[in-house]
């Protein structure tokens, strides 16, 4: 052949290799498609197969299947513990129905107030930025004596006041207010 043939030999080799790869890929895709169609025909006719009794296995606690063969047991709904709540009242008891309306609004409020008016809000006083060294030792001794006297007063109360103390713990806002008041130093 002449030296001006147009395409070098390696381009013809590359073109032949790509053509061969295309033919092989086409053969694999066609065989995969035929195999898939044959499997679908097998699965279509599998519903006609009836298993023998010993082949059918029913699980004790099935997750997804075998639910149609299980006989439902009668449920006893009294086995659950009743929640602690207000008992249901009948319409024939007018005294009990009117009783919650007589309770003040503060007693019914549990945790958060929904009143967003400025009138009801109180600001906390700003903390003073004085160093402990600036205060005299007398004020520290006085606060320690006051705390000891408060502890002694609490212990000296008779048992009748235990009801008042327990009611303080029922109201979290009041309890935290008392704790904050005890922590702030007396000036």
From Swiss-Prot:
Organism the protein comes from = Mus musculus (Mouse)
Q: Name one GO biological process term.
A: adaptive immune response
Question: How would you describe this protein's topology in the membrane?
Answer: Single-pass type III membrane protein
Coiled-coil intervals: none
Instruction: Tell me yes or no: is Disulfide bond among this UniProt entry's keywords.
Output: yes
* Protein name (Swiss-Prot/TrEMBL): T-cell receptor-associated transmembrane adapter 1
Report quaternary structure and partners. Answer: Homodimer; disulfide-linked. Interacts with CD3Z. When phosphorylated, interacts with PIK3R1.
One CC-aspect GO term: T cell receptor complex
Region of interest (Disordered), ranges: 117-138
PTMs per UniProt: Phosphorylated on tyrosines upon TCR activation.
Q: Which residues carry this modification: Phosphoserine?
A: 46
In which compartments does the protein localize? Cell membrane
* Keywords, alphabetical: Adaptive immunity, Cell membrane, Disulfide bond, Immunity, Membrane, Phosphoprotein, Signal-anchor, Transmembrane, Transmembrane helix
Chain segments annotated as transmembrane? 8-28
Cytoplasmic face: residue ranges? 29-187
Tissue and organ expression note: Present in T-cells (at protein level).
